Amino acid sequence: MNMDVNAVRSSIRGKHWFNVLTQNFEAIDTGIASLHVANGQLDGMEISVLSIVADEHNLYPRARQGEVGLLEGWSLAFAVDQIIQADRELEKKRSIVCIVDVPSQAYGRREEVFGIHQALAGAVDSYARARLAGHPLVSLLVGKSMSGAFLAHGYQANRILALNDQGVMVHAMGKESAARVTLRTVDELESLAANIPPMAYDIESYNSLGLLSNLLNVSNADEPTDEDIEYIQQALKNAFEDITLSGVNDLKHRLDAENRSMSKRVRELLREQWT
């Protein structure tokens, strides 16, 4: 069971950023209230924007605060696959933006029985296929990007951007859960994280792992100004241009950061042994 279930609070950041970045876009019916999709243009570039949002009336109680659950996983998989199929014959594929503000995957007995692992894997598969098919894929982290929810929605992107704000964090589990699992207090966990970047919750520590392409400074992450919106739109445009110029659709660049040197070395040694 997720020991953070009762601690999760609904965030509206993802929904708000989705709304301001998709003004005058065409809203796409996804069949569920917790997945928003819109198609439009960014400086003449065709893009699709996807975001998971809170739905207090979600059929599954464990997925009412913006978590990625059974419905969200399969709906993401279908929505992204629709994009792939629509552009299959086009030489230039449309770009995809994932707006990420997800507190967790949905934990519950029903989720386990009905196979949430398959639902989330379906979303991962569709995003990976889109990237490999040539769709430039950029994730914008505006809030929590936690656990399997982030793996299902956002992690497969060619480039990951994040707001440089204390409300943005990436981790495998919440602090309270991590403290219980490691038999520490939250204060002890934070002290440990100060010297071990993968254990930390702040976005700057995550950035040191080489997984982010850019940290973006905005004046107000909760209520972005017109200047903030223009700045983020330009950052997205720059990221898409960088993807196109690189001509690469894999994720190997994530291993180039200093704190990933041993990860890179392990892969090199395994490759030597297996070939």
Q: Where do the protein language model's features map onto the residues?
A:
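Glycine-rich anion/phosphate-binding loops
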Residues: D29-A33, G66-Q82
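Short acidic, glycine/proline-rich loop/turn micro-motifs
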Residues: L59-A63, Y107-E112
